[in-house]
């Protein structure tokens, strides 16, 4: 007896998951149990369309896709770039925009001008390292922080 195959979606927890579900609803695909704000479940199923959804921390979603635990993942471009997994970006859904910026004391500007080593704290160390190395030709010390 063969097991029925489900199309599995890994969704980053939070706003992107909600926006993704809203998008699915626009085309007639629902998963009512995901709307229950009190649920502690992380895996949800739509039996009608043979779809499985699971909620994960956003940085883990590309890993689930790369290793086949999910067929499709929905995360922000920042996560795709930072995690640098062997995945293919099929479509930009056009929501969940973010902006990254570099800020610091005015004295850091002088260090950058003279290509002196600076210290950079970021939630996205790979993106920061790539930016400073390839765009600014600057060697930096990266400190990983997890944001607020």
Predicted regions: what they are:
Residues 1-148:
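Domain-level signature for soluble enzymes in the chorismate/prephenate branch of the shikimate pathway
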């Amino acid at each position: 007896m063969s097991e029925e195959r489900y199309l599995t979606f890994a969704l980053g927890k939070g706003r992107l998951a909600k926006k993704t579900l809203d998008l699915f609803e626009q085309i007639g695909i629902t998963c009512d149990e995901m709307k229950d704000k009190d649920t502690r479940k992380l895996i949800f199923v739509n039996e009608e369309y043979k779809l499985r959804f699971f909620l994960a921390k956003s940085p883990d979603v590309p890993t689930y896709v790369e290793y086949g635990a999910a067929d499709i993942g929905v995360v922000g471009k920042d996560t795709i770039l930072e995690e640098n997994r062997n995945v293919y970006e099929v479509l930009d859904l056009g929501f969940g925009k973010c902006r990254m910026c570099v800020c610091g004391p005015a004295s850091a500007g002088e260090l950058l001008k003279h290509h002196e080593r600076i210290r950079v704290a970021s939630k996205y160390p790979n993106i920061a390292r790539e930016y400073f190395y390839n765009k600014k030709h600057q060697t930096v010390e990266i400190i990983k922080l997890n944001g607020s």
